[in-house]
Amino acid sequence: MRFKLIFFLFTLFSFNSYLCQENDNLILNPSFESIDGKLRKLNQINVANDWYSPTSLKADLFSSSVPGDIGTPENIYGKEFPKEGENYAGILTYSYNNKKPRTYLQSMLIKPLASGLNYCLNIHVSLSDLSKYAIDNIGIHFSEEPVTLDKKGDIIFNDKAKLSAVVTNEKNKIYKSRYKWETVCGVYQADGKEKYITIGNFFNNKDTEYEKLTKSDDFPGIQSPNAYYYIDNVELIL
């Protein structure tokens, strides 16, 4: 009888732990798998449920269900298999001499962050094959209200208050891996009431470290003077 009770309690504890692990992530649609509408072209991140872009130039959504420019694993920017599922997003984080505007991802959290608690952030990124540059400074910004810019352009934070709400990798390394996902990992201590996240590069070009890369022989095409990254499997947990 005692053995059965212990076994029951162990099973219950394991099940509850499993449920907690499944529900820990505060990011809605973290792998961009849930979509609503027809994905037809670039700049359609809004087809992914719960995701959009804060500027007038929209981020991209790629899917194995759509061949060509917006497919996976091959698309207009390179080749990469999804980290999880069938889809991933893509953003431009750097352009040499600011020739092209950046793009960003934004979403509302499942619930507001609690004051004083530390949250662990993980974003998986992969540099596209046709990017001539790789950069650091890929991060996530937390805010109570959505960040907006009613035109094409870069969202640059110059004041300390906004920069303190940007989380990058602790070592803030340059992300230059192609054909392999790297993790942007950081910890954010919440002020409380943060409801939104925005993903991208919030630093100007002179404060962004970059590395110029030779073209990969594994994918045809001409390099562009940009740093374009695929994004997948976004996670924010206590």
What are these model-predicted stretches?
Residues 1-27:
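Bacterial Sec-dependent N-terminal signal peptides
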Residues 15, 128-129, 231:
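Short helix-capping and hinge/turn segments at secondary-structure transitions, especially at repeat
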Residues 21-108, 112-114, 138, 152-238:
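Aromatic (Trp/Tyr/Phe) and Gly/Pro-enriched flexible surface segments
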Residues 110, 124-130, 189:
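Solvent-exposed strand-to-loop "edge" motifs in beta-rich extracellular domains
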Residues 118-123:
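A short tyrosine-centered beta-strand micro-motif
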Residues 126-134, 146-148:
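Extended, low-complexity, turn-rich repeat/linker tracts enriched in Gly/Pro/Ser/Thr and Asp/Glu
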Residues 136-144:
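Conserved positions within compact, well-structured domain cores
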